[in-house]
C-alpha cells in the first residue's frame, strides 16, 4: 500500500496484499495503534484522509467525521457523477476534491485560507481573532512520505493588517527622521505594492495623524514612568534657531530614579514666535510644568546658551513660588558648561585666526592632492618624524576639529618646514613665530577640549565633575596673565572675564555638589577657594556653608514620614530622651548634615559611585540623602552630547519649520522616546544573554 501526501491520490488496497495486523494512519496526527489494544478484522486497513475513509472492499463506505479545520470554510458538492468539488464558503471558489476513486487532499484548500488569498478573509480576519490563522501551515516536500508533522517547527501565518502596517510606517518615519511626504513618493508606493498589493496607500495627512497618535501613546508611557520618581526634577533649556526667525525650545528633565540612577527625558519642543523676548523662555517653562504636572517638583533650571539677566530673573519666580526648599530660586545656571567652554575656545581661535589660516592652507595643500600627500609622507619618512598624527581639515563649526588640526600640524611642523624643498608647489610654509603661536593656542585649548570631552564619555556628568575643571582653568588663566608673552597674556585676559562670570553664577551650585561627595565635602571647597579668591576666600567659603545649611533646614521643614507629627504635636514620644541626651553629654544633638560633615573623608578611589553611596546610606541620613539626591541630579550641561563642540546654536531644518508646531514636537519627542526604549530593550536582552552564559 502507498500513502500519499494530501495532494496525491490514494490507491486501493486490492492491488496490494495487506498484512493481517491492523494499521490506522491518521492524516495530520500519524497515530499508529497496536493490534493488542484494539482488535480489528484481518483486512481492515483504514486510511483516514482529512475528509473521509475509503474501504478496500466494495462494502458500503463507513464515513468518518472530518477532522481538518479547513472544513469550517468549505462545503462538498457533487458537480458530475463520481466527481465532487470543494466550495469556499467565503468567496465560493471551487477546488478539486474527488474524481472516482481518486481523492484530493486538503493542502490546496489550506493554502487558500492560510496564505490569505481568499478575498473574503483578507480584510476581515487577523491572527488574533481568526482561530484558523493560529494554525501553522507547513509546505509539503516533493518526496511522498508518511506525515508525522511537528507543530513546533512551523512558522505561523500572520494575516495582513492595514492598521498595523500604518502604525509601523509611522514608527519608521519617526525613528529614522524620514519626511512625512515619503508615503506619497512613487518609489515608496511601488515598493509597498510589490510586497503587499492589498495595502491601501496613505496620504500625508493620514501619516501625520498616525505619527501624532504614536507620540501621544508614548507620552502616556513617559508620564507613567515619571509618576514614581521620588525626588525633584531639573530642567535644561536648549534653544534652536531657524531661517524663519522662529525659535524652538527643547526642554529636558533630569532626575534620579528610585534605583539611584541619573536619568533624563525630553519633555517638550516648543515653538516661540518671538524668541528674542525676555519672557519667551519663562513661558516655555511654565507650559512644560503645567503640562507634565511638575508644580512643586522643580529644583533647578540650566540654560544651554547665555541668557539675558532679565530672562534668568523671569525664571527664578517659577522655582521659588511653588517650589519651596531651593534657596529662593538661586539654583539657576544661566549658561551651561559646554557653551561656556565653547565660548572660551571661540575666543582663543579668534585671537589666533591669522595663524590658524596659515596652518589650514598648509594642511589643505597636502590633503587636496594625492601627489602632494605622497610627497609629504615620503618626506616624513625621510626625516623620521615619530608622530602618528594624521592631518585633516577642520570643520569650522566644530571647534574641536580645529584644535585637532593644530595639534597634528604642530607635531608635523618639521615636515612642513622642509616641504618646499620636496614639493615645488608648496610656497608659503608657516614661520617659526607661527608655530610658537600654534603651541600657545593648543596650550589654552587642550584643557577645554579634555573637559568638554568628558560630557561625551560620561553621558550625564554631574556638577562634581566640573568643579575641579572650572577652578583649575581659572587658576591657569591667572598664571598666564602674570606671564610676559603679550600674545598669551592677551588671550588669557579675554578668557578670564568669562570664567569669572561663570564662576560667580555657578560656584554655589558646583560647590554644593562637591559637598555632597563624601570624598571631598567642604575640604575641597576650602582648598580651591583659597587658590582662587586669596584673601576673600573666607567670605566665599562662608557663602557655601551657609547655603548648604539653609537648604538642609528647608528640607527638614518639608513634610515626610520621618518628621510628621501626631495630633498631639509630638513626633515619636521620645522628646524626654532627647533632653536626657543633651543633659548627660553636655551638647545638643548634631543634625544629619553636621554629622556627615564631621565624619572622615572617604578614600578617593577612581571607580567611586557617589549615588550608590547615598543609596546605601539613606537610612543613616534620611533627610540629607533626599537633599543630596536632588543636588547631584543638577546637570552642568544642557547640550546634547553630539553637539557639545558646536560653535553656534543649532538650527531647525527648513522641512520641519514647514510643519505644524505640534507635529514638530511629536516627531522629535517620539523619536527620542522610541530610540531610548529600543536601547533599553537591547541592553536588557544583552544582560539576560550574559547571565545565561555565565550560569552555563
UniProtKB/Swiss-Prot annotation:
SUPFAM superfamilies: beta-beta-alpha zinc fingers, Ribonuclease H-like. Changing residue 109 to A: Loss of DNA-binding capacity. A zinc finger (BED-type) spans 65-132. GO terms for cellular component: cytosol; nucleus. Residues 129-148 are annotated as: Disordered. Zn(2+) binds at residues 88, 91, 112, 125. Disruption phenotype: Very slow growth and absence of expansion of cotyledons or development of normal leaves or floral organs. Short root with an excess of abnormal root hairs. Extremely rare production of some photosynthetic tissue. Disulfide bonds: none annotated. PROSITE patterns: ZF_BED. The keyword Transcription applies. It comes from the Eukaryota. Transposase-like protein that is essential for plant growth and development. Binds the promoter region of the DNA helicase KU70 and genes involved in chromatin remodeling. May regulate global gene expression by recruiting other cellular factors. It is found in: Nucleus. Residues 129-141 have a biased composition (Polar residues). Homodimer. It comes from Arabidopsis thaliana (Mouse-ear cress). Keywords: DNA-binding, Metal-binding, Nucleus, Transcription, Transcription regulation, Zinc, Zinc-finger. This is Zinc finger BED domain-containing protein DAYSLEEPER. Residues 592-674 are annotated as: HATC (Hobo-Ac-Tam3) domain. GO terms for biological process: post-embryonic development. One of its GO terms (molecular function) is DNA binding.
Amino acid at each position: 500500500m502507498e500513502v500519499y501526501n494530501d495532494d496525491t491520490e490514494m490507491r486501493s488496497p486490492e492491488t496490494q496484499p495487506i498484512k493481517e495486523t491492523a494499521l490506522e494512519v491518521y492524516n495530520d496526527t500519524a497515530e499508529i495503534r497496536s493490534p493488542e489494544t484494539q482488535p480489528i478484522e484481518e483486512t481492515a486497513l483504514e486510511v483516514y484522509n482529512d475528509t473521509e475513509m475509503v474501504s478496500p472492499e466494495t462494502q458500503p463506505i463507513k464515513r468518518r467525521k472530518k477532522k481538518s479545520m479547513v472544513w469550517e470554510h468549505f462545503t462538498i458538492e457533487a458537480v458530475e457523477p463520481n466527481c465532487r468539488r470543494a466550495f469556499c464558503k467565503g468567496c465560493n471558489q471551487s477546488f478539486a476534491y474527488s474524481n472516482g476513486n481518486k481523492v484530493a487532499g486538503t493542502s490546496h484548500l489550506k493554502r487558500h485560507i492560510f496564505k490569505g488569498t481568499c478575498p473574503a478573509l483578507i480584510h476581515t480576519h487577523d491572527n488574533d481573532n481568526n482561530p484558523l490563522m493560529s494554525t501553522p501551515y507547513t509546505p509539503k516536500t516533493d518526496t511522498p512520505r508518511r506525515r508525522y508533522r511537528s507543530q513546533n517547527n512551523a512558522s505561523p501565518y500572520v494575516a495582513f493588517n492595514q492598521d498595523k502596517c500604518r502604525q509601523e510606517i509611522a514608527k519608521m518615519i519617526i525613528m529614522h527622521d524620514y519626511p512625512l511626504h515619503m508615503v506619497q513618493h512613487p518609489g515608496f508606493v511601488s515598493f509597498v505594492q510589490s510586497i503587499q498589493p492589498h495595502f491601501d496607500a496613505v496620504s500625508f495627512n493620514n501619516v501625520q495623524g498616525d505619527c501624532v497618535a504614536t507620540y501621544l501613546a508614548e507620552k502616556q508611557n513617559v508620564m507613567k514612568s515619571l509618576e514614581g520618581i521620588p525626588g525633584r526634577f531639573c530642567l535644561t533649556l536648549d534653544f534652536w534657531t531657524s531661517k524663519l526667525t522662529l525659535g524652538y525650545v527643547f526642554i529636558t528633565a533630569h532626575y534620579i530614579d528610585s534605583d539611584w540612577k541619573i536619568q533624563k527625558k525630553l519633555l517638550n519642543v516648543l515653538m516661540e514666535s518671538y524668541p528674542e523676548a525676555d519672557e519667551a523662555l519663562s513661558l516655555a517653562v511654565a507650559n512644560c510644568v503645567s503640562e507634565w504636572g511638575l508644580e512643586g517638583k522643580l529644583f533647578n533650571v540650566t540654560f544651554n546658551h547665555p541668557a539675558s539677566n532679565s530672562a534668568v530673573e523671569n525664571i527664578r519666580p517659577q522655582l521659588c513660588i511653588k517650589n519651596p526648599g531651593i534657596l529662593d530660586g538661586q539654583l539657576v545656571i544661566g549658561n551651561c558648561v559646554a557653551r561656556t567652554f565653547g565660548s572660551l575656545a571661540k575666543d582663543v581661535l579668534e585671537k589666533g585666526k591669522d595663524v590658524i589660516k596659515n596652518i589650514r592652507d598648509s594642511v589643505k595643500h597636502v590633503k587636496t592632492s594625492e601627489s602632494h600627500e605622497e610627497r609629504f609622507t615620503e618626506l616624513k619618512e625621510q626625516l623620521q618624524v615619530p608622530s602618528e598624527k594624521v592631518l585633516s581639515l577642520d570643520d569650522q563649526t566644530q571647534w574641536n576639529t580645529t584644535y585637532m588640526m593644530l595639534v597634528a600640524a604642530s607635531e608635523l611642523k618639521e615636515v612642513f618646514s622642509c616641504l618646499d624643498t620636496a614639493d615645488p608647489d608648496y610656497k608659503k610654509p608657516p614661520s617659526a613665530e607661527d608655530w610658537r603661536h600654534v603651541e600657545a593656542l593648543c596650550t589654552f585649548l587642550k584643557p577645554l577640549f579634555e573637559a568638554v570631552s568628558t560630557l561625551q564619555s560620561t553621558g550625564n556628568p554631574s556638577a562634581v565633575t566640573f568643579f575641579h575643571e572650572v577652578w583649575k582653568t581659572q587658576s591657569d588663566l591667572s598664571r598666564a596673565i602674570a606671564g610676559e608673552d603679550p600674545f598669551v597674556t592677551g588671550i588669557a585676559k579675554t578668557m578670564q572675564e568669562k570664567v569669572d562670570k561663570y564662576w560667580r553664577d555657578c560656584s554655589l551650585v558646583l560647590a554644593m555638589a562637591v559637598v555632597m561627595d563624601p570624598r571631598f565635602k567642604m575640604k575641597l571647597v576650602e582648598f580651591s577657594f583659597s587658590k582662587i579668591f586669596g584673601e576673600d576666600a573666607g567670605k566665599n567659603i562662608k557663602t557655601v556653608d551657609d547655603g548648604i545649611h539653609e537648604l538642609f533646614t528647608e528640607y527638614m521643614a518639608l513634610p515626610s514620614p520621618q518628621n510628621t507629627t501626631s495630633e498631639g504635636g509630638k513626633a515619636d514620644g521620645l522628646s524626654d530622651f532627647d533632653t536626657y541626651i543633651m543633659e548627660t553629654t553636655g551638647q545638643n544633638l548634631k543634625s544629619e548634615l553636621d554629622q556627615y560633615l564631621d565624619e572622615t573623608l572617604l578614600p578617593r578611589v577612581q571607580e567611586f559611585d557617589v549615588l550608590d553611596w547615598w543609596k546605601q546610606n539613606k537610612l543613616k541620613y534620611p533627610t540629607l540623602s533626599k537633599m543630596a539626591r536632588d543636588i547631584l541630579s543638577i546637570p552642568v550641561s544642557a547640550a546634547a552630547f553630539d553637539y557639545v563642540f558646536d560653535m553656534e546654536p543649532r538650527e531647525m531644518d527648513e522641512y520641519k519649520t514647514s510643519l505644524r508646531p505640534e507635529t514638530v514636537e511629536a516627531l522629535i519627542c517620539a523619536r527620542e522616546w522610541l530610540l531610548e526604549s529600543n536601547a533599553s530593550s537591547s541592553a536588557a536582552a544583552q544582560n539576560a544573554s550574559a547571565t545565561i552564559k555565565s550560569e552555563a
